[in-house]
Amino acid sequence: VFNSPTPKIAAELLEAKKINLVMDNWFFREAGSKSLPPFHHDISYFDFEGSMCVLWIPLEAVKKEDGISWVKGSHLWNRLFLRTRFNDGHHVDGKAGIINGKKYELTPNILKNKNDYEFLQWDLEVGDCIYFDIRTLHGGLNSVTPKKDVHRYTLRMAKENSKIIYRGDWAREERAIMEGNGYKNGDDLSGKMFPTLFEKS
């Protein structure tokens, strides 16, 4: 994370002077799992606001029909969708409407309206990666049951002037951790929880 070209590439993509780490995640899908990752965008899951990108890395080779699909251009829709859980039958947190001053909608039913969208998918080998805007809708497009365990790793990175902006109650657990470390609504994504990964000299 700290000693790789990753944040410099993020800075180029976001036209940023500085890149801070927002969070990293490790995803595991068990062999035989029939549950698809729901279509969602990461921006509404947590109390973060600003220009951010996600680095997505497969930890084993993946064919495009088995992997994640991205809805082309969805980062430009200027819409916020409610958080959809990956478990619990893809339960949606909250109700559509105005929450903390922002309008949230139900995520469109991508799977039932595939012809309405253009999708981006790739065959990937170990060592390949994808960067995408944190507002981009993505999820599982094809009902493929993995024969082996599937592992993915992601990094979320933020451009300077990104902020902590409180969203719905669904983010309260992560919010409590931030508040326990001295952060509050409106603070910059910087400091000990969000270290600087890259800064132009």
Language-model segment annotations:
Residues V1-D24, D47-G50, V92:
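Signature of the catalytic double-stranded beta-helix
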